[in-house]
Amino acid sequence: MGSLVLTLCALFCLAAYLVSGSPIMNLEQSPLEEDMSLFGDVFSEQDGVDFNTLLQSMKDEFLKTLNLSDIPTQDSAKVDPPEYMLELYNKFATDRTSMPSANIIRSFKNEDLFSQPVSFNGLRKYPLLFNVSIPHHEEVIMAELRLYTLVQRDRMIYDGVDRKITIFEVLESKGDNEGERNMLVLVSGEIYGTNSEWETFDVTDAIRRWQKSGSSTHQLEVHIESKHDEAEDASSGRLEIDTSAQNKHNPLLIVFSDDQSSDKERKEELNEMISHEQLPELDNLGLDSFSSGPGEEALLQMRSNIIYDSTARIRRNAKGNYCKRTPLYIDFKEIGWDSWIIAPPGYEAYECRGVCNYPLAEHLTPTKHAIIQALVHLKNSQKASKACCVPTKLEPISILYLDKGVVTYKFKYEGMAVSECGCR
């Protein structure tokens, strides 16, 4: 598995190097091939590192975390996300103290745009069609069907409209009864409508069953009838379901799921941050004694042997070029990803910049390996490169994006913003 942290760090360092902290350059205006000559200094101390490989690895890790195989190809027309999904994103983006019940939230819209409701003896039927696809490794926490009810009544006479709503699943016919429809009741409830508004129905069990079946296309039917079995009197008011695709009240199927990968991702990120410490250059330096046995004593001995050479370097470090976190704003439009990333338009990712010369400051939390590496480099720069200024603590961001036309919200996309830097 590629190193997400290292590739992100490499990309951020490159962007800052080219634009000096400004938003990412327009890749179309500056082809990668033309700029490769500028990158030599950035990776001069990392033998065998190919920049194109780093960029591709970063892209692959980003898409993998979002369960995408490639950058989604979207229609040129701008997709208007459901108001509910925008409200959801804005709520958790502004209120850091709250969190959703699941890490991933998908909204599936009604695909049946041509069928009309049917009325018979006070019963109104609304056909709905959803294409639902949930990865098998995810756990469905909750699912709900959101319907916008249209209440029509004489406000001078009636306080509200009293109706019973039943949600059916239309099952596939088997055997010789292909012409017959089998209906399964998913949920039923009573509504006293006074104003047009959203109503929510729990369909969690059905979505879990759909996920296991592997089938993506599912048909529902909404029945609305009077509570007292009398024929609906238009003069007493009506309650309907808004199924029009021309507005923002189209029926929605909202699925809350958890990929259960947050803990695993955090552990992998920590491992990735130190994986580059296994440098082949150190294998030939005869430093085995530092990793086993009296490591502290050996470290002190090496320090005393080369401390005389550090005075001038310490003066240079005091000029403020030491390893630290610096601003780096990522603009999704600049890199052409605004066609499928709905929100945010960009974010402050930060980056780690500066040198890790000896002596390594305590606030940079250097590992023993980093200290040894810095000492070896101080003694002979040809044998080992300097310790690297890298992220040691990362924070997630929330993202609202399109996945094959499905508006999807991910509360925690791990490892996207640097919160602390150190020498490794």
From Swiss-Prot:
Disulfide bridge positions per record: 323-389, 352-421, 356-423
Tissue-by-tissue expression: Detected in mammary epithelia (at protein level).
Compartment annotation: Secreted
Main location: secreted
Up-regulation conditions: Down-regulated in some breast cancer subtypes and breast cancer cell lines.
Protein's job: Required for maintaining the proliferative activity of embryonic cardiomyocytes by preventing premature activation of the negative cell cycle regulator CDKN1C/p57KIP and maintaining the required expression levels of cardiogenic factors such as MEF2C and NKX2-5. Acts as a ligand for ACVRL1/ALK1, BMPR1A/ALK3 and BMPR1B/ALK6, leading to activation of SMAD1, SMAD5 and SMAD8 transcription factors. Inhibits endothelial cell migration and growth. May reduce cell migration and cell matrix adhesion in breast cancer cell lines.
Official protein name in the record: Bone morphogenetic protein 10
Organism, scientific name: Homo sapiens
